[in-house]
Amino acid sequence: KDPKKAAMWCEKAAEQGIAVAQNSIGYCYDTGFGVEKDTSKAVFWYRKAAEQGNVGAQYKLGKCYYYGKGTEKDNEEAVKWFRKAAEQGDADAQNRFGYCYEYGEGVAKDLAKAVEWYRKAAEQGYDVAQYNLGTCYANGMGVAKDIAKAEEWFRKAAEQGVDMAQYNLGVCYGHGYGVAQNRAEEVKWYRKAAEQGYADAQHNLGYCYANGMGVTKDYAKAAEWYRKSAEQGCAEAQYTLAELYANGYGVAQNKEE
């Protein structure tokens, strides 16, 4: 394994106009693989490849413009390249293009178009787009509100490990949104998100333990999860943890803490 030689030969091929090599050497400069990191050189090579239709380079060039990395930040230019990659079927770009439509970044805000592009990426199995599409259905954004479809897309994303989707699927089970209420399933999905560090899920899991919902009541475990959430700044968890300390539930009583 010799990153320097890999980069050297890649650059030679790039200089001869090979698009895939231009994309690869751009990535080398972007990440410092085998060369000294230089984001402006990354942009130079991504552009060369993107102009030849290389879909990966089009997406990465869009990201450079979006974040102002190696070039001036320019949302309109970012959208131009996201669109090109999205139209070639790149799921990353389709999701990002949808996001730009949802928030009106570099393009006029259009929730229906956001849904259209999220759906294209989601149907390719792109996890974050599945979550985004679920959120659109849950809130009636760009599409008729449909809790059952929201639950369906949250589940797809949750099963791929998206913490926000796992949390929302837990909420669906807790309230019977689009699915039969099931406290054990609620806890299962909160736990998955909580173990990934998602603060709202940590709070809700603590609540389930404190109230014996879907699990055996256990104030010590409730306090453990409330603390994790509180340490991330969740105000509700901070207040509830204070109450647990004040009353000695699951923790040694400590009115000062």
Question: Can you describe what each PLM-predicted range is?
Answer:
Residues 24-31, 35, 60-67, 96-103, ...:
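Hydrophobic face of amphipathic alpha-helices that form TPR/SEL1-like repeat modules
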Residues 4, 8, 21, 59, ...:
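Alpha-helical tetratricopeptide repeat
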Residues 10, 15-18, 31-33, 38, ...:
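Short helix-capping/linker turns of helical repeat alpha-solenoids
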Residues 8, 18-20, 25, 55, ...:
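Short hydrophobic transmembrane-like helices used for membrane targeting/insertion
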